[in-house]
């Protein structure tokens, strides 16, 4: 059995992270020895009675900046615990995290060290101790904790054995550059809306055709940016020429 995929999160607010990492799929992954998470309070590496981790910015301005001394000390300690792990700061100025990023990170078996920023940002001198920065998109959060949990969740789902169904991570949205097809469960009719006939047919080939067709249609309608990058096969082109009742 392979060793668990290691993740360490450096944060000023461990309580924000603890509950999420211990619940649902992530909690079960740790119980099964597939994922190993460590949550480190950056304040443990701050000196002085009050363990101060922030200070006013040089040049003036609103807010406070995270000090380099405790943060670099925490990063160095995490690196010692996880040799070779990628060290990434959750930051709005980093490249946008995508499913492709998650696949790249899970292949790095030495694991991840995620640094959660706070306040107006992090002293620039910390950057020399990172492997990079990572963003969820063009918006600003109060801190990096939510972003870090998102990254851990997406990466952990790709660790072999974490998802009960081996096909689950392969058929989800974005794995083929397409949105996932809609899902239905019982009852077959709810408030007059019926589950598509193809899904009730028991014909696996027909079900696969419907799912592929719906995935293509949804992506075209809702994410034209993704659809523009899709290379349609001849089979896809034939599917798109058909109506739903013809599938």
Swiss-Prot record:
Keyword NAD assigned: no
Positions that bind S-adenosyl-L-methionine: 117, 136-141
Biological process according to GO: tRNA N1-guanine methylation
Main location, first listed in the record: cytoplasm
EC numbers: 2.1.1.228
InterPro entries assigned to the protein according to its UniProt record, in alphabetical order: Alpha/beta_knot_MTases, tRNA_m1G_MeTrfase_C_sf, tRNA_m1G_MeTrfase_TrmD, tRNA_m1G_MTases_N, tRNA_MeTrfase_TRMD/TRM10
GO cellular component: cytosol
Keyword annotations: Cytoplasm, Methyltransferase, S-adenosyl-L-methionine, Transferase, tRNA processing
Localisation per UniProt entry: Cytoplasm
Residues spanning the signal sequence: none
Record family assignment: Belongs to the RNA methyltransferase TrmD family.
The protein's role, per its UniProt record: Specifically methylates guanosine-37 in various tRNAs.
Subunit structure, interactors included: Homodimer.
Xref: NCBIfam families: PRK00026.1 (NF000648), trmD (TIGR00088)
Protein name according to UniProt: tRNA (guanine-N(1)-)-methyltransferase
The species this protein was found in: Myxococcus xanthus (strain DK1622)
């Amino acid at each position: 059995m392979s060793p668990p995929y290691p993740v360490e999160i450096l944060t000023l607010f461990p309580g924000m992270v603890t509950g999420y990492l211990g619940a649902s799929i992530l909690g079960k992954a740790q119980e099964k020895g597939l994922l190993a998470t460590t949550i480190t309070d950056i304040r443990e590496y701050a000196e002085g009675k009050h363990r101060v981790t922030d200070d006013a910015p040089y040049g003036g301005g609103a807010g406070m900046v995270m000090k380099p001394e405790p943060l670099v000390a925490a990063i160095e300690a995490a690196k010692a615990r996880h040799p070779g792990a990628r060290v990434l700061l959750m930051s709005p100025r980093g490249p946008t995290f995508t499913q492709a990023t998650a696949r790249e990170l899970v292949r790095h078996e030495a694991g991840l060290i995620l640094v959660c920023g706070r306040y107006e940002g992090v002293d620039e001198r910390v950057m020399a101790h990172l492997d990079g920065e990572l963003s969820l998109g063009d918006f600003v959060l109060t801190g990096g904790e939510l972003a870090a949990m998102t990254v851990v969740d997406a990466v952990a789902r790709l660790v072999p054995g974490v998802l009960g169904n081996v096909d689950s991570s392969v058929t989800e949205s974005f794995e083929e550059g397409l949105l996932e097809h809609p899902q239905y469960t019982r009852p077959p009719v709810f408030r007059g809306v019926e589950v598509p006939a193809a899904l009730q047919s028991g014909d696996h080939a027909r079900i696969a055709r419907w799912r592929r067709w719906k995935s293509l249609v949804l992506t075209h309608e809702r994410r034209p940016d993704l659809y523009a990058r899709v290379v349609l096969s001849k089979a896809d082109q034939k599917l798109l020429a058909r109506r739903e009742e013809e599938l």
